[in-house]
Amino acid sequence: MAGKLQAHNIRIRTFIHATEDPEKVLEALETLFPEEISPKDVEFEVIETEGYFGNPILVVDAEIKHSRNIRKFLENLRGLLSKEDRKYLWEHAEEKVDETGTFYIRFDKQKAYLGEVKVSEGEDVIHVRIKVKAFPMKKEAVVKAVREWLEGED
């Protein structure tokens, strides 16, 4: 049975480039969210900025803070991960967790738009940062908690 991962908050970020349809990018983001979490349960912020060559970019930030919604998001996310992606994240947990206890995952934005959740190390991604609760709050404890969450039956 998979362990339960507890978190203080979850932050999701992606970029909308001038060549992309904002509605499609937002649909890709929705792929990560369970139906039980409504948009009013998530703090969204959109920031307009420019790329290196002056091209317009929208930065979309979403944050989940309430424990009930965090729990639902994490349960849903684990269910969306393929066995291969869970294995990959388990094997790379040391490098995907920082000293502050944040677990970083990147998902392929194009595949998410098609309804598929796929871990990616590419550039065109949806960034998910999970601020994990662990005791003691040390990297080793967070890595252990993340690995326990990733383990288990389908």
Swiss-Prot record:
Gene3D superfamilies recorded: 3.30.1440.10
Keyword RNA-binding carried by entry: yes
Key word RNA-binding present: yes
UniProt GO MF annotations: RNA binding
Keywords annotated in UniProt: RNA-binding
Xref: PANTHER family: EXOSOME SUBUNIT, EXOSOME SUBUNIT, DUF54 FAMILY-RELATED
Subunit field text: Homodimer in solution.
Function (record text): In vitro, binds efficiently double-stranded RNAs in a non-sequence specific manner.
Protein name in the entry: RNA-binding protein PAB1135
Lineage of the species this protein comes from: Archaea, Methanobacteriati, Methanobacteriota, Thermococci, Thermococcales
